[in-house]
Amino acid sequence: MPNNNLTSNQLLAKDYLEELDFIDISKSDTKDLLLMSKQFTINKSSVEIITEISHNFPLKYPKFYTTDTTMFLKYPHIEQHNHRISGHRLCLDADEDKLYYENPSDLLYDSYNRLEGFLNKIENNEFDKNEIFDEFDSYWCKTTGIVHFNKELIQKFKSFKVIDSYIIKTEDKELLFIEDEKYIEQFCKSANYNFIKNKIVYINFERELEKNIPRTYSELKSLIQKLGYLSSLQKIKKAKNILPVILFSIFIPGNKETHYAAMYFDEIKSTNVVNFINPFLSDSNSNKVFYGMPAMNISNSRLYKRGGNLMNVNVHKKRKKIAIVGCGSVGAALAHKLVKVGCNNLLLIDPETLSSDNIARHLLGMEYLEQNKAIALKRYLGKQFLDIEISAVDEYVEDVLNDLKDCDLIITALGSDANHIEEKIIRDAINKNSAPVISCWFEATACIGHGILFDSTCDSKVFNMNKLFNEIMLLDEKATSMFVKSDVGCNSNYMPYTYLNANLHLNHFANMVTKYLMDEKIKNHWVSVGEIGSLDKYLKSDLKVEDNTLIKRDF
């Protein structure tokens, strides 16, 4: 049925394809899509190819589908069956290789040539037999669910294994995890989620899929029998809480890496069926098809590598314990950045509760109002990763100084220049009575940020904290007194500051901390300069700051 709602570019494509002997097979339920079909002869067999032209063509490239199901899993670049089109998509264009075409006809010409080239390679048997594994997940995965697994737990299993799995129920979906139970509990407690413990079957297929990739129950059963695991599967056919999923691993040909994916069995439980295994083993279901399911490695070594580089992985491997004294706008945001770069063992200390006055510049939002900052921050950070160790103390640091003794680094993040408690912590570091300290604070309106490392290299005999802080400040005292505000009440003074300025400095603080954790030799004093604006008149007489300048210097 011809589609009467086509755009001018779709009509152009229709005329172009008709000249190539395609015919219009658009359906009423395909709405704004143009579907064109043509029969090609491949290896003496007639194969239907369907072309899909979107209403966004040429911004969306033409898509090609084959209705020949025997081509799937036999040749590369052919994806799972698309029920909307009733065919398997031919993936001929990588997103990173796509160009913008000013002339839609040029795109049609190039796309059709790529299609012919692909079909010719099939005709001439030019595809490497192992090429299908290079993009395994692209065509294997069919379901929307994902198995999130920790590879470090799985890789020790060499054959067949029934392992613990967990379904975490979020507000709008259920997530499947294979991870240490203590981390599941910790994550769910932080996120206020519930979880259900189940079992899942894991099979190591080794190199067997190189010879034949199964599609049906009978093909998979034959493969499992060949590997000697069929009896193991039969033993658990009456076991409860077995998910209808098989996680499996294979060796990618020509690659030393082990790849993981999963299979989903669409078996509805009945009173007579305990799990999916009985229907799977039944001869009456031999031609039934299971669904490919993606499996994602969530081990921290993988996540940190994807989220940055090997530095993140190495920071995580150090597993150094970091205390953050002060979980206000500076400490909370810095803790978040450090967790994201691999610091997974934090001690958070702050006696205060989160006030609405701080919401605009604090990492935590309205959800955490009137909660202790350290405990609320622990909950927030606990939702970022599974394998993370965070403890929170809702007391004044002077009352819990002993808690700092087993830390590898102490960060004081009080947001402004030091007080007498911070001086005590710093002097302990200088005198080797505690771990080194990095003090992080801002000058007026957060236009300037300071990160200072205090350790045993500092001379305790000449150390004078107030003198030091006054010397390294870039603004004179007038700037501080000019911008300090006061609310009603005792100890109600505060310094307003620009969020964007603060975030700039926090990135430098995190960079400084990371380099220190990696045992790099760093300068003791880092200064970052944000938007100075009208405050340039308060710069000390011997200083001049250009826009976007980062200053690093020792003291």
Where are these regions (language model features)?
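Rossmann-like NAD(P)-binding element
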Residues: 374, 380-392, 404-419
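Glycine-rich phosphate-binding loop and adjoining beta1-alpha1-beta2 segment
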Residues: 353-385
